[in-house]
UniProtKB/Swiss-Prot annotation:
A GO cellular-component term linked to this record: transcription preinitiation complex
Record lineage: Archaea, Methanobacteriati, Methanobacteriota, Thermococci, Thermococcales
One of the protein's GO biological processes: transcription preinitiation complex assembly
The name this protein goes by in its record: Transcription initiation factor IIB
Pfam families named among the record's database cross-references: TFIIB (PF00382), Zn_Ribbon_TF (PF08271)
GO MF term (any one): TBP-class protein binding
Binding-site residues, Zn(2+): C7, C10, C26, C29
InterPro entries in the record: Cyclin-like_dom, Cyclin-like_sf, TFIIB, TFIIB_arc, TFIIB_CS, TFIIB_cyclin, Znf_TFIIB
Record flagged with keyword Metal-binding: yes
Function: Stabilizes TBP binding to an archaeal box-A promoter. Also responsible for recruiting RNA polymerase II to the pre-initiation complex (DNA-TBP-TFIIB).
Family affiliation: Belongs to the TFIIB family.
Keywords, comma-separated and alphabetical: Metal-binding, Repeat, Transcription, Transcription regulation, Zinc, Zinc-finger
Zinc finger (TFIIB-type): 2-34
Amino acid sequence: MTKQKVCPVCGSTEFIYDPERGEIVCARCGYVIEENIIDMGPEWRAFDASQREKRSRTGAPESILLHDKGLSTDIGIDRSLTGLMREKMYRLRKWQSRLRVSDAAERNLAFALSELDRITAQLKLPKHVEEEAARLYREAVRKGLIRGRSIESVIAACVYAACRLLKVPRTLDEISDIARVEKKEIGRSYRFIARNLNLTPKKLFVKPTDYVNKFADELGLSEKVRRRAIEILEEAYRRGLTSGKSPAGLVAAALYIASLLEGEKRTQREVAEVARVTEVTVRNRYKELVEKLGIKVPIT
């Protein structure tokens, strides 16, 4: 039998709940009976049954980064359990873990998403890039595009595609190094996925200028050099010199030229290492830009 609340001031048993303040007050004298009450109800409002059904939820939100989208539950650990019960719960947890990835498709998805987590963490990519890569991979699985390709190459290709879609500057070489997959293999998977998921060149286009700050930071170049490099790249783009060229190679050459023009010289080897391209690539792009744009580089 529950004891009825009584106001200690006036003896009234009538109370008012104020949800905004989290208080229960006496309806007669206004004395605060309880305060700091946590509202366990929903944070939304519904005006009919259908709205209530749509807006109601329980548990944690779904996550595309988990193979089961976070919809399963885990059997917890209680150290106060006796030996036999603890052993029983251990077995249950073990079986539950197996059942969560009970078939090959689930196991492959779980492995792919763990690999995605590793790659994006090491590349220090933002969460929205990781989520976009996961979405692309799930779509590729749904369309049967994984067959005949390694999971590692496809997940790496999805990371590269996500970076390009969201204009986050990362080169194929960087992703290849972290993914531990040959650059050519990732490139093949990337082109295949882009073609079959309708990722058009327009969607995937990354302006070479997006890479300028990234490379300039590593080379320790000033804002003046960066601005000059961007000017060179924008002029090259206007004249149609960037089509079909690697953004990394173009940026490396533009930064090399800008560093010479602004008196902050960096060697071709230095810029090539930062851009993860060969010195030959830097040299070829350098010659093209200087000749086609009529840039007079000081002789050093």
